């Protein structure tokens, strides 16, 4: 009997994940996990390599961890959950991953297929209640592929396909269901035992399309680059910095989910596109589903729009207008390299134009810096604490390469961000709860770097804080959690005011459905999990409390600051 035939499919499944470079399985187990648990228990006596398995007591945290882990490491993680109910708990975070093009393998058990006749047949009443006609339907709109492992199939082949699809551009999550009987059955040997890079090679942009884009940008008096996440790959961040500097093209990181251009770069013109969009006669958009809000940010008449990305039409979005003059499909890092080369020819002899633009943009940047500095000075003594002052204090104390995971906690325009993969913004899906688990995943990917999870109080509720603090302690992943606590659902309040600026709700002393008082002592939640916790209510308390928090984290103790902040707007 061969080794492949002697071992269970569950063992083959775990081995193949490790063979393909998966380092972590983030798991929330149920009765469907019996073969997986048996496989893990057998492993110490074998020479088979498995990914490290981490227990995460809530599915939302587990998927958010995988999300944050990929954003910092560039590697996919696997999340395993309990049948239909675990999948349902994971779907919110799965939506976030899908809209953020994050490859995650979400694996779920399937209630046993058989009532009798197999050691893994149904033996609990829930095994009838948890079955669905179409379990994959829970996820189908937000995954690239879903499949159920079947009897007689090599687990290796299914793992390979899952990883390849997830890691092919545009990247995204996949869903795999794993029946208990199939996992317990003897493994089927793979047809081919090859290991190669994950995913299909990314498409290279059309040379002719890039040449046309260069012609449009070189003819413009005031070209502009907008991006949300092109800097997710550090090499693309380097290319963008070189292109923007060489041709004096300003960059606005609208709806930033990653830091794509260092905030100290001379062509970094902030994160709000409003003013520059009104002036730009050519706009190049890289990796941005919503580069501006059409009803709020009018474009200059006759402005030319060029959109770059692996899917510049964002075909997974049901409706998205954003009409463009040119759509360039391909990997954006490659597009930047090609565009820089094309512009070097198109802009030859245009030194005066470039340098004139550079001077004007230098003045605009200095004005932007002065405005931020003046605003910090104006608000630094205000009580409750202004979020911009909180960001300013954080800048003064954090490590240069610290990773900030920001979910409605801090104004990104107030942060100093100069290192690749140092900023993780929220997904456009808007599923609250990403910030906490995302911070753990970032720390798992880069244990040597400081990780700061900045969340609103509403986001903290949704982040399943007990599960978060448990994993932080159990896995020795000390993060600094900052809660910007305005005691309200601020986004809900602001949305109501935007739609009904003169309405009854806007004029009311207390708007329905937004108040979160009486607020808990969130810092005590961290203390209950052996962390450091402190409440901050005045500006004078902030810097000393931040220092104590950083001291705790740097010594290996998770820390949480509960900061009472202003209701903005």
Regions picked out by a protein language model, each given a short descriptive name:
Residues 1-4, 150-153, 302-405, 508-511, ...:
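Phosphate/pyrophosphate-binding active-site segments
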Residues 10-20, 31-40, 362-448:
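Active-site diphosphate/adenylate-binding microenvironment
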Residues 44, 70, 166, 244, ...:
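N-terminal cationic-hydrophobic initiation segments that often serve targeting/anchoring roles
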Residues 286, 308-310, 406, 456-457, ...:
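Active-site flanking residues adjacent to catalytic metal/cofactor-binding acidic residues
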Residues 2-349, 469, 478-481, 502, ...:
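N-terminal alpha/beta PP-like core and its mobile active-site loop of ThDP/TPP-dependent enzymes
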Residues 171, 218, 300, 399, ...:
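Short conserved AdoMet
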Residues 116-129, 277-279, 320-321, 328-329, ...:
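Thiamine diphosphate
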Residues 177-182, 409-411, 564-566:
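A glycine-rich phosphate-binding loop feature that marks nucleotide/adenosyl-phosphate handling sites
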